[in-house]
């Protein structure tokens, strides 16, 4: 939620959340956050900040602000998850979730381009193996619970409704500019 409480956004991982966070930050402060918006500890109200939770709850209960979320084609979302979270090196210089990638290499035969992610590898074969892993996590909760980056979008979106929220807008990453413009046009700031 913006500090001005003009917009409430339900985050859905791998659905333009960084871009949306930066736009919301800009709408209140006239500048973008210097760094990764996920690392911001001020300038936005976030659910993971205990002091923000009562403000978000009250705003959502009274439906005081424009409330929106963003969804994405499931194939594009899981492909993005694969390249970002499995093949990529994270902001901290390490692999995502520590031992997850080594386990995928061992149990599923996934290749990720070597320790630095820069070596050539069969991306199609590895992605197909990753899909088997993602299916196993979703269907059987093995070898782990589904990760937020590839669990169903509907689960993320529905938690807001179940907890009393109501969306004014749902935009699509595939039509991001158009959808975000509608959100900004409808928001008071």
Write out the residue ranges for each language-model feature.
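Membrane-interface amphipathic segments in extracytoplasmic regions
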Residues: 1-189
């Amino acid at each position: 939620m913006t500090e001005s409480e003009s917009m409430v956004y339900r985050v859905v991982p791998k659905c333009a959340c960084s871009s949306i966070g930066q736009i919301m930050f800009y709408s209140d402060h006239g500048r973008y956050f210097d760094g990764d918006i996920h690392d911001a500890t001020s300038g936005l109200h976030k659910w993971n900040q205990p002091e923000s939770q009562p403000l978000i709850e009250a705003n959502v209960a009274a439906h005081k602000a424009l409330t929106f979320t963003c969804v994405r084609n499931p194939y594009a979302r899981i492909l993005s998850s694969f390249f970002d979270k499995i093949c990529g090196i994270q902001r901290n210089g390490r692999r995502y979730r520590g031992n997850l990638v080594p386990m995928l290499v061992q149990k599923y035969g996934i290749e990720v381009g070597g320790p630095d992610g820069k070596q050539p590898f069969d991306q199609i074969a590895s992605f197909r193996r990753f899909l088997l892993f993602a299916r196993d996590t979703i269907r059987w909760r093995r070898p782990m619970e589904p990760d937020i980056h590839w669990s169903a979008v509907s689960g993320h979106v529905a938690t807001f409704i179940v907890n009393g929220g109501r969306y004014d807008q749902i935009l699509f990453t595939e039509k991001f500019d158009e959808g975000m413009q509608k959100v900004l046009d409808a928001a008071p700031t």
